[in-house]
């Protein structure tokens, strides 16, 4: 399979022309999945029977001349923290190992209404807390470009699924970079929409004011198509914005001549920024300039305060959200408890992994009496200042540009005993979540060792259309993936 022929529009045309059936397309991807899965450990659940049944149903509908949705017959994967009715949703945690949701998340429901076919639920860091997909209770996922390296996290399974060709596209969630960082590490496109652009109904909550659902794809155009399907108001989610959804594909081919691209100074001065990443991202900026965009250096003085701010706010919200897992109504329950109190404490101690427990403790401490003003409230104040820095920057530019991650994918186990080093992998993505802005990671190069590098483009609130336009124009001009190194598990 050539990645240039693996786009949604290309497959849709082949399906409409009768060059391939939905069943044949699904079987191709299942075969690819079954070949790669023993090496990659991408999936927590593989839904072969459901996928084939859905494909057969769509083929019958097509033969009967029925109207079909824009994703009809296309195999998709879903991060295993989005509820799928009748299919296990585990959050890669022992706590929810056997949980089968009785309802469907809004985002996935819209995919199925558009004709998408579920091939499986993808691995993640437990409860989406991590940056490497190593904290999963079911084992780590590996990077398709180099099995000794991580795929990023927390949506590492969704990124690796697209990169390895076991699905055409996938969904992930992004709380502090969990779509964009894995997209960078795995050499795919990852889009985090504006907070509230996509419903969070049915997304198992980590940090409710930061979480957002978004797509992984092999191209910017595919990401635009997926966003078109999943975006829009939802009365079941009070934080979902009640605003019209524009046509995200309409402006992709428009010139970016005259647009102003802000290069955030603090990001290129960041401690620990890899030299190859710096060079690749600066080359991406130069490519945009060659396309007619104007590069403007801008300052976001509090950008690098994002990490400290996030690691007060996100654990605080996690502490509250995960309080529901007590072994009483559903989820893991410890055996042989002598009382309700010991049953609850034992269930949480045995059901949650080390990283989840660490973040719950941090959050509980930050919210405790005597510390809430010094930590949580102060962090919220800094969050406001970070947002104001972005507001000021967008007064003079149309989009912002940074590296997606400070380095290419690191080796598995490299940060096992140093959680702070792991947290710093999201240094360049976290501020975007704190401000609720849309951002996209697009491949922009490779390291000397053959690992992908991503450039992050950041848009203003609800300006995904322009963000996608700039990203698409860059992608088409740079054509980075045509010069990619060979990797046995990347088609």
Curated annotation (Swiss-Prot):
Gene3D superfamilies linked to this entry: Amidase signature (AS) domain
InterPro entries: Amidase (IPR000120), Amidase_CS (IPR020556), Amidase_dom (IPR023631), AS_sf (IPR036928), GatA (IPR004412)
Any GO BP annotation: translation
The entry's keywords: ATP-binding, Ligase, Nucleotide-binding, Protein biosynthesis
GO terms, molecular function: ATP binding; glutaminyl-tRNA synthase (glutamine-hydrolyzing) activity
Annotated signal peptide: none
Reaction(s) this enzyme catalyzes, per UniProt: L-glutamyl-tRNA(Gln) + L-glutamine + ATP + H2O = L-glutaminyl-tRNA(Gln) + L-glutamate + ADP + phosphate + H(+)
SUPFAM superfamilies to which the protein is assigned, alphabetical: Amidase signature (AS) enzymes
Active site positions: 79, 154, 178
Matching PROSITE patterns: AMIDASES
A GO CC term attached to the entry: glutamyl-tRNA(Gln) amidotransferase complex
Record flagged with keyword Protein biosynthesis: yes
Keyword Ligase: yes
Record-listed E.C. numbers: 6.3.5.7
Pfam families: Amidase
PANTHER family per record: GLUTAMYL-TRNA(GLN) AMIDOTRANSFERASE SUBUNIT A, TRANSAMIDASE
Assembly and binders: Heterotrimer of A, B and C subunits.
Purpose: Allows the formation of correctly charged Gln-tRNA(Gln) through the transamidation of misacylated Glu-tRNA(Gln) in organisms which lack glutaminyl-tRNA synthetase. The reaction takes place in the presence of glutamine and ATP through an activated gamma-phospho-Glu-tRNA(Gln).
Family of the protein in this entry: Belongs to the amidase family. GatA subfamily.
Name of the protein in question: Glutamyl-tRNA(Gln) amidotransferase subunit A
Native source organism of the sequence: Synechococcus sp. (strain CC9902)
């Amino acid at each position: 399979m050539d990645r240039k022929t693996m786009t949604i529009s290309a497959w849709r045309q082949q399906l409409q022309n009768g060059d391939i059936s939905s069943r044949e397309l699904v079987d191709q991807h299942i075969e690819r999945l079954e070949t790669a899965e023993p090496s990659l450990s991408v999936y927590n659940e593989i839904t072969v029977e459901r996928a084939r049944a859905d494909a057969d149903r769509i083929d019958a509908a097509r033969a009967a001349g029925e109207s079909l949705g824009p994703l009809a017959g296309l195999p998709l994967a879903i991060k295993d923290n989005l509820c799928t009715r009748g299919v296990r949703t585990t959050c890669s945690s022992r706590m929810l190992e056997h949980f089968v949701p009785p309802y469907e998340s809004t985002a996935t429901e819209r995919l199925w209404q558009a004709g998408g076919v579920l091939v499986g639920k993808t691995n993640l860091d437990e409860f989406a807390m991590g940056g490497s997909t190593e904290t999963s209770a079911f084992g780590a996922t590996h990077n398709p470009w180099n099995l000794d390296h991580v795929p990023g996290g927390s949506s590492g399974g969704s990124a690796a699924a697209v990169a390895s060709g076991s699905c055409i596209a996938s969904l992930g969630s992004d709380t502090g970079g969990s779509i964009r960082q894995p997209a960078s590490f795995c050499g795919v496109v990852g889009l985090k929409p504006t907070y509230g652009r996509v419903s969070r109904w049915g997304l198992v909550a980590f940090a409710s004011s930061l979480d957002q659902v978004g797509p992984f794809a092999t191209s910017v155009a595919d990401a635009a198509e997926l966003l078109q399907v999943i975006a829009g108001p939802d009365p079941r989610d009070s934080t979902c914005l009640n605003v019209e959804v524009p046509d995200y594909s309409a402006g992709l081919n428009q010139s970016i001549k005259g647009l102003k691209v802000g290069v955030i100074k603090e990001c290129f001065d960041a401690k620990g920024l890899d030299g190859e990443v710096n060079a690749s991202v600066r080359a991406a900026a130069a490519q945009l300039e060659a396309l007619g965009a104007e590069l403007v250096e801008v300052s976001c003085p509090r950008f690098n305060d994002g990490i400290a701010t996030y690691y007060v706010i996100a654990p605080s919200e996690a502490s509250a959200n995960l309080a529901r897992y007590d072994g009483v109504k559903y989820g893991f329950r410890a055996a042989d408890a002598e009382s309700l109190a010991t049953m609850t404490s034992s269930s949480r101690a045995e059901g949650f992994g080390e990283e989840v427990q660490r973040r719950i403790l941090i959050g509980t401490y930050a919210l405790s009496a005597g510390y809430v003003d010094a930590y949580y409230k102060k962090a919220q104040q800094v969050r406001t200042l970070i947002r104001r820095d972005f507001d000021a920057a967008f007064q003079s530019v149309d989009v912002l540009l940074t590296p997606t991650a400070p380095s290419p994918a690191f080796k598995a186990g490299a940060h096992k005993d140093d959680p702070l080093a792991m947290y710093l992998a999201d240094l360049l993505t976290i501020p975007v979540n704190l401000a609720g802005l849309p951002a996209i990671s697009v491949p922009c190069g490779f390291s000397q060792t053959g690992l992908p590098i991503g450039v992050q483009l950041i848009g203003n609130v609800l300006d995904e259309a322009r963000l996608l336009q700039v990203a698409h124009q860059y992608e088409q001009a740079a054509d980075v993936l045509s010069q990619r190194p060979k990797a046995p598990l990347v088609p």
